[in-house]
Amino acid sequence: MSAEILNPNLRRVVLASNNAGKLREFSALFAPLGIELVPQSELGVSEAEEPHATFVENALAKARHASRHTGLPALADDSGLCVVALGGAPGVHSARYAQQPGGARSDAANNALLVRELAAAGDRRAWYVALLALVRTENDPCPLIGEGLWHGEIVDAPAGEHGFGYDPHFYLPQQGCTAAQLAPEHKNRISHRAQALAQLLDKLRATGPVDRP
């Protein structure tokens, strides 16, 4: 099957993230579209600040930062876990939930804190959120936004070797396993990021030319 090639200006896009797990997932999702994702670290771009209270504002800030420093179109993801019993926390703070001032981020520490916080909670419902923002230029007046939600439950015991972040504790009742137990190719079809990407690409096709070789 021929790859679907989007607007030639989008053949090379900087990914506004230094997260290796996100790079793997997004590279796999974008490869069939003929789009090369280049991590911002390879282009000497530092991480942007994430001062905002919403996923969409943080995603836009990161995308504009990467585009400003590279002159390339930029894709940013701001995603996180929202837990009903915690009032939507950790939310936009998911990646640094257990981070101490001046300390490093750690998936293990984040997961341990999450389990402790839910020790007495009967309601384990949670959902992953993914917000994707694609800007063609730093000052793109019409950035493309895609949103995806993935519902599940938090379990105490981790299971699975795939994925990253909270995946070992994110149980999917319909699949009967955690997100970390899904094969990567399966996860990439149903995850919050896959849903957000599908929405973003629908908008991209509606606003720009699509060439099919």
Swiss-Prot record:
Mg(2+) binds at E49, D78. Binds 1 Mg(2+) ion per subunit. It comes from the Bacteria. It catalyses: XTP + H2O = XMP + diphosphate + H(+); dITP + H2O = dIMP + diphosphate + H(+); ITP + H2O = IMP + diphosphate + H(+). Substrate binds at S17, N18, N19, A20, G21, K22, S79, F164, G165, Y166, D167, K187, H192, R193. The active site is at D78. Its cofactor is Mg(2+). One of its GO terms (biological process) is purine nucleoside triphosphate catabolic process. Its EC number is 3.6.1.66. CDD domains: HAM1 (cd00515). Transmembrane segments: none annotated. GO terms for molecular function: dITP diphosphatase activity; ITP diphosphatase activity; metal ion binding; nucleotide binding; ribonucleoside triphosphate phosphatase activity; XTP diphosphatase activity. Keywords: Hydrolase, Magnesium, Metal-binding, Nucleotide metabolism, Nucleotide-binding. The keyword Nucleotidyltransferase does not apply. One of its GO terms (cellular component) is cytosol. Belongs to the HAM1 NTPase family. Pyrophosphatase that catalyzes the hydrolysis of nucleoside triphosphates to their monophosphate derivatives, with a high preference for the non-canonical purine nucleotides XTP (xanthosine triphosphate), dITP (deoxyinosine triphosphate) and ITP. Seems to function as a house-cleaning enzyme that removes non-canonical purine nucleotides from the nucleotide pool, thus preventing their incorporation into DNA/RNA and avoiding chromosomal lesions. Homodimer. This is dITP/XTP pyrophosphatase. It comes from Bordetella pertussis (strain Tohama I / ATCC BAA-589 / NCTC 13251).
